[in-house]
Each structure stands twice: as structure tokens, then as C-alpha cells.
Swiss-Prot record:
Localization terms from the record: Cytoplasm
Gene this protein is translated from: sbmC1
Subunit structure: Interacts with DNA gyrase.
Protein name stated in the entry: DNA gyrase inhibitor 1
Organism taxonomic ancestry: Bacteria, Pseudomonadati, Pseudomonadota, Gammaproteobacteria, Enterobacterales
Organism: Dickeya dadantii (strain 3937) (Erwinia chrysanthemi (strain 3937))
Parts of the chain that traverse the membrane: none
Pfam families in the record: GyrI-like
Length: 153
């Protein structure tokens, strides 16, 4: 798998924090996020999923994720935030790979990316979260083009 390592600036984000199996919570979170963005006329810079924890070590019901849009640093939540949060995605060195995901099989792409990094002797930074940036509307296109980000030391 092709990837590059580069410094990524901090991102400001707004959206929803979820707990549970990613294959269930992330799609639900994006449905909630799309509705929230539309209802509050939020102007997203990017659509992003942030993943916390290691699914090989953490039980599925305890996995955490954020479904968010990146926003300007001066963004403020609407008064009726409907459970939305603001958060930041940490700056630092990240390995970044661009992939096309078919059949909603995001896990396979992530596993291949981790295997490539570990095979190349890269050290993953557990203090920062992994995240993916969506480059297209997979609901209408039938596939997802994403940039996967894994924090490295």
C-alpha cells in the first residue's frame, strides 16, 4: 500500500461522539451529522470519522468514534446543539494513504494500512487518534474515496 508521512495541522471539528461497534455507530453518526449540518446550515470544510481505541484490544461495545465535519477555529455550536460537540483532531506526524472503499468494507483498508506501516517498521503513536477524511459522496457514487490518517512517531 502506498502512503506518505507528513505533518498534519490541528483540525477543529463539530459533530457527534459515539460509543459502540464502529460498523453500526459510524453510519448512524453520519446520518445524524448530515441532518444536523442541513438543519443548522453548518458549512463543513471536510467530513471526517475519528477512531479511538484498538478494535483488536477493545470490546466492540466500548469502541469510540467521532463523526464530525471540520470547521473554522471560531465556530460555535448552535444554541440547540442536539448533543453535538466541538473537538480537535491533534496535529502531528501522520502516515496518510488514499484508498477507494467498496461494499462499505472500511475495515479491510485499515487493516492493510496498519500491516504496511508495521511491516515498514513504523511506530504508531497511541496518544493520538486515527481518522479518515471523505473525498466524495459514497452514498451517491457507490464507493468511498478516503484519506486514512494513522499517527506515527
Amino acid at each position: 500500500m502506498d502512503y506518505n508521512v507528513q505533518h498534519v495541522d490541528k483540525r477543529h471539528a463539530a459533530g457527534f461522539h459515539l460509543v459502540g461497534p464502529w460498523e453500526q455507530t459510524v453510519p448512524q453518526g453520519f446520518e445524524q451529522l448530515m441532518k444536523w449540518v442541513d438543519e443548522h446550515a453548518v458549512q463543513p470544510l471536510e467530513w471526517v470519522a475519528v477512531y479511538y481505541g484498538n478494535p483488536q484490544e477493545t470490546p466492540p461495545e466500548k469502541l469510540e468514534a467521532d463523526t464530525v465535519v471540520s470547521v473554522s477555529a471560531d465556530f460555535h455550536l448552535p444554541a440547540d446543539g442536539e448533543g453535538a460537540i466541538t473537538t480537535e483532531i491533534a496535529a502531528g506526524q501522520y502516515a496518510i494513504a488514499r484508498v477507494r472503499v467498496s461494499n462499505d468494507d472500511f475495515g479491510m483498508s485499515w487493516q492493510a494500512f496498519f500491516a504496511a506501516l508495521l511491516g515498514d517498521g513504523k511506530t504508531i503513536d497511541p496518544a493520538r487518534a486515527c481518522f479518515e477524511v471523505y473525498l466524495n459522496d459514497g452514498y451517491s457514487d457507490g464507493f468511498w474515496d478516503i484519506d486514512m490518517h494513522i499517527p506515527v512517531q
